[in-house]
């Protein structure tokens, strides 16, 4: 397979970083230059749009693409990283009723707002990745960023778990959404699974047939 000078859609596996996945791709297919259009959490899987060699000049435009995510969350647990990999900070004992949750999600259609990114993120603070500072318990503050939820739909709801399909603007932080959602009901939540199902015009049906194992 020749992936030089092309736009390639990768299904990033769970438990590796987007950068590590990109390096595996470059090494496996002998690609000299490549970039992707948006970091996925190590916990997440799904669509990673990669541009190679001459097509990398298109990344600035690809970075503007809207995204779709399927997130699975668990109520009643809050961690420092906002996901199941983090240290548990607080637990609660309340789960909203399905009608409450559905009504709130419906109210978010075409909702633009300022979102606070998680401290455990790839954003840079004075040249250092925020997650590196967070791991060292260094105090710092991130600024809220403008974003938009186009649609939020409840897919399933059982016990303390909910699955929600999100159509959002680029730069949206799903982990922050999970925490903010729970706070609307005076409870807690953490992200337990995340799949990016679409990025711009590309979806999971467009991914190449290759397993990126370590």
Curated annotation (Swiss-Prot):
GO terms for biological process: mRNA pseudouridine synthesis; tRNA modification. Keywords: Isomerase, tRNA processing. It catalyses: uridine(55) in tRNA = pseudouridine(55) in tRNA. Pfam families: TruB_N (PF01509). It comes from the Bacteria. The active site is at residue 41. It is an enzyme of class 5 (isomerase). The keyword Ligase does not apply. One of its GO terms (molecular function) is RNA binding. InterPro entries: PsdUridine_synth_cat_dom_sf, PsdUridine_synth_N, tRNA_psdUridine_synth_TruB. Belongs to the pseudouridine synthase TruB family. Type 1 subfamily. This is tRNA pseudouridine synthase B.
């Amino acid at each position: 397979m020749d992936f030089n000078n092309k736009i390639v859609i990768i299904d990033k596996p769970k438990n590796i970083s987007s950068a590590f996945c990109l390096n595996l791709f470059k090494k496996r297919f002998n690609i000299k230059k490549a970039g992707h259009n948006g970091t996925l959490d190590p916990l997440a899987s799904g669509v990673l749009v990669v541009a190679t060699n001459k097509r990398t000049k298109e990344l600035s435009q690809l970075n503007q693409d809207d995204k779709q995510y399927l997130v699975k969350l668990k109520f009643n647990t809050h961690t420092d990283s906002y996901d199941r990999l983090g240290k548990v900070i607080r637990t609660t004992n309340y789960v909203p009723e399905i009608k409450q949750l559905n009504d709130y999600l419906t109210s978010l259609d075409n909702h633009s707002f300022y979102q606070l990114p998680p401290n455990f993120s790839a954003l840079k603070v004075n040249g250092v990745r925020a997650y590196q500072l967070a791991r060292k318990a260094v105090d710092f503050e991130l600024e809220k960023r403008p974003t938009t939820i186009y649609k939020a739909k409840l897919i399933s709801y059982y016990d303390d778990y909910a699955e929600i399909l999100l159509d959002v603007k680029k730069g949206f932080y799903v982990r922050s959404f999970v925490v903010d959602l729970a706070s609307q009901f005076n409870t807690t939540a953490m992200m337990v699974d995340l799949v990016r199902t679409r990025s711009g015009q590309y979806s999971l049906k467009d991914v190449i047939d290759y397993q990126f194992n370590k």
